[in-house]
């Protein structure tokens, strides 16, 4: 089933809330990490099956380690393919990272932004696409260490891999913001100005934790981030992509800017992994996504007619 509109990540803690949603809710689809469900059974799987009968499913991988050196895990790929076939899922994305090195590392570690890494990751993406028999999408990740060997910036790296592998781009707006603030290398708005919008087919939005005080808002006119390539600038705060907080206003603003830049409005999902508030608060955030989508879809149509 095709994805559209606003969605919410399915978590076991939210199972009952998903099942209680009315048919006309603003939650149009749900997303799962396949690693959590390939071998899951019992009551948790029964509730998941009930939810999957009602909501189209996006599948977002955690462990393929597209940037890793070890051969791709064919057993995991087979499990992903079987899960997607069972639930008629038509969308799969994975992180631009690696998570194994002589063993599983249980974290998503960043790649050096180099031409060699572009070729390496793109080849592995092509292998995944051949195995699954479909185009996948690549998500930009948050990272906390910038490689000194990088020869390009983050958005150039993402675009180059997507073009080389002929894959989609899964845009994580919160990750763009977190990286922009933490590293001071790339204005989040400039990232969106340069991303290959023709390949963006899915969006994530989430909350982050401010470890050392609130971050100052970043805007397109911020001179400190004006150039697409810049020098490292130490910042007094650290943002951590936790998925455990409400979406910050700065990130909502960035999502709106993304919608303005894109030629279409992609399906957009709210991520929340822990520290769950009352479900009404999560629902309100999904509702806000839907409202922004409707607003900018209307503006896109009006602009086309004006042209």
From Swiss-Prot:
InterPro entries: MbnB/TglH/ChrH, Xyl_isomerase-like_sf. Pfam families: MbnB_TglH_ChrH. Transmembrane segments: none annotated. PANTHER family: UPF0276 PROTEIN HI_1600. NCBIfam families: PRK05409.1. Belongs to the UPF0276 family. This is UPF0276 protein PM0211. It comes from Pasteurella multocida (strain Pm70).
């Amino acid at each position: 089933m095709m994805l559209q509109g606003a969605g919410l990540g399915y978590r076991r803690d939210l199972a009952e809330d998903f099942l209680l949603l009315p048919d006309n809710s603003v939650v149009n689809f749900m997303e799962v990490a396949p690693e959590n469900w390939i071998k899951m059974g019992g009551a948790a799987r029964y509730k998941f099956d009930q939810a999957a009968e009602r909501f189209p499913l996006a599948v977002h991988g955690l462990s393929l380690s597209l940037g890793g050196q070890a051969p791709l895990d064919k057993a995991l790929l087979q499990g992903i393919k079987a899960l997607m076939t069972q639930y008629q899922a038509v969308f799969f994305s994975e992180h631009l990272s690696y998570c194994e090195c002589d063993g599983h590392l249980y974290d998503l570690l960043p790649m050096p932004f180099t031409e060699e890494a572009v070729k390496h990751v793109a080849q592995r993406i092509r292998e995944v696409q051949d195995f699954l028999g479909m185009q996948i999408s690549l998500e930009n990740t948050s990272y906390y260490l910038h490689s000194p060997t990088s020869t390009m910036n983050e958005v150039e790296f993402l675009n180059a891999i997507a073009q080389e592998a002929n894959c989609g781009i899964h845009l994580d707006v919160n990750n763009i913001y977190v990286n922009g603030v933490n590293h001071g290398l790339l204005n989040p708005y400039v990232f969106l100005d340069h991303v290959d919008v023709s390949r963006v087919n899915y969006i994530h939005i989430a909350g982050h934790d401010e470890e050392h005080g609130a971050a100052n808002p970043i805007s397109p006119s911020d001179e400190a981030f004006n150039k697409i390539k810049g020098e490292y600038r130490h910042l007094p705060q650290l943002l951590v992509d936790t998925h455990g907080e409400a979406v910050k206003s700065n990130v909502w603003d960035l999502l709106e800017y993304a919608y303005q830049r894109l030629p279409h409005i992609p399906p957009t999902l709210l991520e929340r992994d822990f520290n769950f508030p009352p479900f009404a608060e999560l629902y309100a955030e999904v509702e806000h996504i839907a409202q922004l989508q409707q607003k900018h879809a209307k503006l896109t149509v009006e602009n086309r007619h004006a042209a």
